[in-house]
Amino acid sequence: ETVDTARELFTDKGCRVTFVTSLLTPDVPEDTVETLAITKDDAWVVRTPLVERKPTPNGQGDTFSSVALGTYLKTKSAKDALEAAVNTLYGLVSHMDSGALDLPLIDEQRQILSPEHPFEAVRC
């Protein structure tokens, strides 16, 4: 249902790739979160453990968007873009100090270049 709605709202109107982040639905276990990449012809999902931070870290959307866009422009693959963005963000968030407000972009830049958690996208 989420895939069909996103495809109708965005992809059918000219967007080549639409990402849906922080997807929590009744069929997703409580301790996990899903992220989708949707194109005209395909849809991919990555499921990761849920890492909750209070307050929500600054820069997550910017980081996800920049990694996803950069990877997509380089590879033309929605699957690759999804995996790179999710793996980078998961690595950064999971290495945050308790109570920190900002992503550790400098201290954990290795998570951008070579994320240590290689979650794989599966077709949905």
PLM region descriptions:
Residues 79-124:
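Charged C-terminal helix
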Residues 44-58:
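Short pre-catalytic strand/loop immediately N-terminal to key active-site residues, enriched for Gly-Thr
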Residues 5-9, 67, 71, 80, ...:
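Alpha-helical scaffold segments in soluble metabolic enzymes
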Residues 54-78, 82:
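Short, small-residue alpha-helix embedded
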Residues 1, 44-45, 75, 96:
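Domain-wide signal for the mature, well-folded portions of proteins, strongly enriched
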Residues 14, 22-23, 59-61, 75, ...:
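Glycine-centered flexibility sites
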